[in-house]
């Protein structure tokens, strides 16, 4: 291989990343126009397009490199020199951290995810940690309450770039001040001020103003979701000022925000203060840098593994028919491997399961479907695997495992946030907690359905409970679009004997679903049945589901709120 080619390859990879992130920012910058035009289908399509950009540009760079090298193989020394040249390009580069992830992706594509060593890849960053604590251009603007909070908020709202009319700006400001007064008290509020991000955060049908409420006793989140009326007028739906509320808004079960971030590391650093419970990976995920979030997630895993004395075990809960799930007892993620063979009732292929997980990645998750990171050739030290889990892996997924002596390589797996399985949660709670869980479960089903997602298998074991008490779906092998399902009423029996027969007295075709049957497995527990009938009886009616299908086919996009209905100003103050 000619000398000097290493620098050309390094420059080609970085230029490829520049092109990718330029397109990323271009798609993101259209969020305001899509919001103002209320083009919600374009919002959904832009989200999918932006997700695809990364892999598309990795592919373009790989083809360029194959042309540059004429398809010749490269030795280890050559690859190390390429990485050295690439590292030298990064100290003054504004998006160095994602550029490192892009380099990793190109390498993995070229070498089929093999020989993934710290010498060849940026397993950990080459740059100083949190390099962007100081940046040339401020990310946010400060607003002080010298003339009262009504005046402050009027300036904040007047500063927004949105070009639509407001329905009633004074009313919304009054509601915000009322909320802040109730939260902080008059004296504390008078001594507080705001710091507001320069860019709005767009997602679904809302534009979010994100800020920091700086009080004498500390800094709080300040989040305002801006929506449109049917007449295209703007209004503020609520004001959120707790870290728990902010954590849910930026949660792992929600779609990525569209926020213009030429310096993503700086934005992540700015967000940390109001999202103290979020990891670096989760913050990058929230702003749409999902591939770099995968890098950070892997780094978090490695750091945890180095500092613990735990072994991987099978995850708690009912064993799945399609996925083998394992975890580290103290780590907040689970690792999911597709089994070699499925239970007989699961008539699907591994490719179908992968397609379902990709569908979830690209779809609006409405706060009810956990995001995942997909890995190939994932290496585990045998000493970190419990004997029982090793036996289970070899029994259920041997075709996906390569034995390297002291290590195993799992050809393909997903990493996902760990939650308490809903069936276990329901066994452990009583009273209001039980009621809240059943309400959350039904709301999760409704919101998924409104977003054109039918879970398929609605058993409690396929849902989890987050640390904030939200119910989230995480078993995707039977997922499909609502519009693909035929919701039917069970025909009346022809004879009394029909109801006692082992086989149904009516024909059942692929895609047929009978909501009346949900009652049999969702209401069997006498503690749960009455609550379900009280709050969610309409889920057992086929006409409820058909009405939702009609709205979807008519092009209606439902509103999705990242907070409780009772927190909306229209409910709370009217």
UniProtKB/Swiss-Prot annotation:
Keywords attached to this Swiss-Prot or TrEMBL record, sorted alphabetically, are: ATP-binding, Cytoplasm, Glyoxylate bypass, Hydrolase, Kinase, Nucleotide-binding, Protein phosphatase, Serine/threonine-protein kinase, Transferase, Tricarboxylic acid cycle
Source organism phylogeny: Bacteria, Pseudomonadati, Pseudomonadota, Gammaproteobacteria, Enterobacterales
Q: Which organism is it from?
A: Escherichia coli (strain SMS-3-5 / SECEC)
Show the GO cellular component annotation of the record. Answer: cytoplasm
**Statement: the UniProt record of this protein carries the keyword Ion transport:** no
Q: What is its EC number?
A: 2.7.11.5, 3.1.3.-
GO BP: glucose metabolic process; glyoxylate cycle; tricarboxylic acid cycle
InterPro entries, A to Z:
AceK_kinase, AceK_regulatory, Isocitrate_DH_AceK
Active site location: 371
Question: Which reactions is this enzyme annotated as catalysing?
Answer: L-seryl-[isocitrate dehydrogenase] + ATP = O-phospho-L-seryl-[isocitrate dehydrogenase] + ADP + H(+)
Where does the UniProt entry say this protein principally localizes? cytoplasm
Subcellular location per UniProt equals: Cytoplasm
Protein purpose: Bifunctional enzyme which can phosphorylate or dephosphorylate isocitrate dehydrogenase (IDH) on a specific serine residue. This is a regulatory mechanism which enables bacteria to bypass the Krebs cycle via the glyoxylate shunt in response to the source of carbon. When bacteria are grown on glucose, IDH is fully active and unphosphorylated, but when grown on acetate or ethanol, the activity of IDH declines drastically concomitant with its phosphorylation.
Report the gene name: aceK
Q: Which GO terms describe its molecular function?
A: [isocitrate dehydrogenase (NADP+)] kinase activity; AMP binding; ATP binding; phosphoprotein phosphatase activity; protein serine/threonine kinase activity
Q: Which HAMAP family match?
A: AceK
Residues engaged in binding ATP: 315-321, 336
Please report the name of this protein according to its UniProt entry: Isocitrate dehydrogenase kinase/phosphatase
Entries under Pfam families matching the protein: AceK_kinase, AceK_regulatory
